[in-house]
A protein has these predicted regions:
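Flavin-dependent oxidoreductase catalytic cores
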Residues: 1-144
Length: 144
C-alpha cells in the first residue's frame, strides 16, 4: 500500500512522525523503534547555544496524567549538526528540525547555521511556555 504524503513540498514515505520535544533526535530510542519505518523524525528544540533547561523536578504526576516542564534543554546547533544530523542520516527518514530561541535573532542564527546542514525541513517553535520568560509563549508576545 502506498502511504506517501507530501508536507510543504517534501515527500514523506508515510505520515508517521515523532512530535517535537518528546523524541530527542532519535538516538535515545534507536534500540526500541526502527527509525527507518518513520516518515520523519521531528527533533527536540534546537537553539543557537546549549540550553540547560529547567531545574529539577521537571516532571510531576497529576490526577489523570503527568505534567512536564523540561525547558527546552538541548545541546545547541553546533553539537546537533556534528552529532545528531549524521546519526539521523544513517536512517531512511526525513529530518525535521524544531528551531527554538529567545529572540528573533536567535531563530535567524539557528536557521542560517542549518542552511548547509543535510536536513529536510524546519519547524519554528513559537509556543513553548516552559521557559524562564514568565511562561509566555514567544508567539504571543507582541514585542517579538
Amino acid at each position: 500500500m502506498n502511504t506517501k504524503v507530501t508536507l510543504a513540498g517534501v515527500e514523506l514515505k508515510n505520515p508517521v512522525m515523532t512530535c517535537s520535544g518528546t523524541f530527542g533526535s532519535g538516538m535515545e530510542y534507536g534500540e526500541m523503534i526502527d527509525l527507518d519505518r518513520l516518515g520523519a523524525v521531528v527533533t527536540k528544540g534546537i537553539a543557537n547555544v546549549p540550553w540547560p533547561g529547567n531545574p529539577t523536578p521537571r516532571v510531576t504526576e497529576v490526577y489523570g496524567g503527568m505534567l512536564n516542564a523540561i525547558g527546552l534543554q538541548g545541546p545547541g546547533v553546533d553539537v546537533f549538526m556534528k552529532r545528531d544530523v549524521p546519526f539521523l542520516r544513517q536512517h531512511d527518514t526525513k529530518i525535521i528540525v524544531n528551531v527554538c530561541g529567545k529572540s528573533e535573532s536567535d531563530y535567524v542564527d539557528v536557521v542560517e547555521r542549518l542552511a548547509d546542514a543535510d536536513v529536510d525541513m524546519l519547524e519554528i517553535n513559537i509556543s513553548c511556555p516552559n521557559v524562564k520568560e514568565g511562561g509566555i509563549a514567544f508567539g504571543q508576545d507582541p514585542k517579538c
